[in-house]
Each structure stands twice: as structure tokens, then as C-alpha cells.
């Protein structure tokens, strides 16, 4: 019986030691964010709340979907790198190729397929991202 317990403990230890878990370091960024407003740096503003545009953030993936947008429903996937004050999106294609046409992603707050945002505000309820041309305001949903 003692040998069986030792064998079981050894197998369990080896099994658990072989597992690596990648944990998300995104902090408040993780979750579903509803795009509430898109402001141009020049002063224009568009209320996007009724279009139900959502950015879903998990681990290193960002998915953009729209549920009431009049032209298209999104379904765009991007990888992202986040630092304390910036967010850089890049295509989710394994080979790094462009998966989408810029004209299709532009209505969802992107001006480039490799977009770089400055994080103006990020907490558990609100997020404000600013690119060279746009300011995106989100609420956590």
C-alpha cells in the first residue's frame, strides 16, 4: 500500500510539474468593452452606443463585434501588446499578413490594421484609448 501511495504521489508530482499555465497580465483590460463614443482629434464626435460595438479582450486576443451596426457585424480578431500606457494591435494571422480591408475595420474605431493607442484611462468600469486620429471611449460590459 505504501509503494502505491509513493508511486501515485510521484506520478501526480510529475504531471503537475509538466503543466505550464499562462496567466493573463491584462489587469482591468480583460473583459467585454462597449464602444460608447468615437471622437476625432479635430473635434468631431459620434455616439456609438446604439450600434452595440464590443471589444472582447482575453489574454492576447482582441475581438471586435457589432450587434446593431447598420453596415457589417465585425468579427475582427487582433493580437495585442499592452504596456502601462499603450495598446498596440496587430493582425491575428499566423503569418502576419493582413486579414482585413481597412475600409471594413474603420467604422469600428480603427484607422490602421496595426493600430497603436495611448491608454488615457483604464479602470474596472471605463477605458479611453487615443490614436493619432481618434479617441475611443468604452464602458465595461
Residue ranges, per PLM feature:
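Sec-dependent signal peptide recognition
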Residues: 2-9
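C-terminal motif of bacterial Sec signal peptides marking the signal peptidase cleavage site
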Residues: 15-18
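Bacterial lipoprotein signal-peptidase II cleavage site
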Residues: 20-27
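Tryptophan-anchored aromatic micro-motifs
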Residues: 27-44
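Exposed, flexible binding/inhibitory loops of compact, secreted disulfide-stabilized domains
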Residues: 30-32, 49, 56-57
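Beta-strand residues in well-ordered beta-sheet regions across diverse protein folds
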Residues: 36, 65, 90-91, 129-130, ...
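Contiguous, well-ordered beta-strand patches that form the walls/edges
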Residues: 39-46, 60-122
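Edge beta-strand at a domain terminus
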Residues: 79-86, 122-141
Amino acid at each position: 500500500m505504501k509503494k502505491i501511495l509513493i508511486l501515485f504521489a510521484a506520478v501526480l508530482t510529475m504531471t503537475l510539474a509538466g503543466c505550464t499555465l499562462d496567466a493573463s497580465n491584462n489587469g482591468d483590460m480583460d473583459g467585454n468593452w462597449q464602444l460608447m463614443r468615437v471622437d476625432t482629434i479635430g473635434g468631431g464626435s459620434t455616439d456609438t452606443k446604439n450600434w452595440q460595438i464590443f471589444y472582447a479582450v482575453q489574454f492576447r486576443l482582441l475581438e471586435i463585434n457589432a450587434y446593431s451596426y447598420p453596415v457589417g457585424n465585425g468579427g475582427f480578431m487582433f493580437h495585442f501588446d499592452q504596456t502601462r500606457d499603450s495598446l498596440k494591435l496587430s493582425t491575428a494571422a499566423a503569418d502576419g499578413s493582413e486579414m482585413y480591408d481597412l475600409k471594413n475595420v474603420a467604422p469600428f474605431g480603427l484607422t490602421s490594421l496595426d493600430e497603436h493607442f495611448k491608454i488615457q484611462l483604464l479602470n474596472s468600469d471605463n477605458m479611453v484609448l487615443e490614436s493619432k486620429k481618434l479617441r475611443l471611449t468604452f464602458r465595461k460590459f
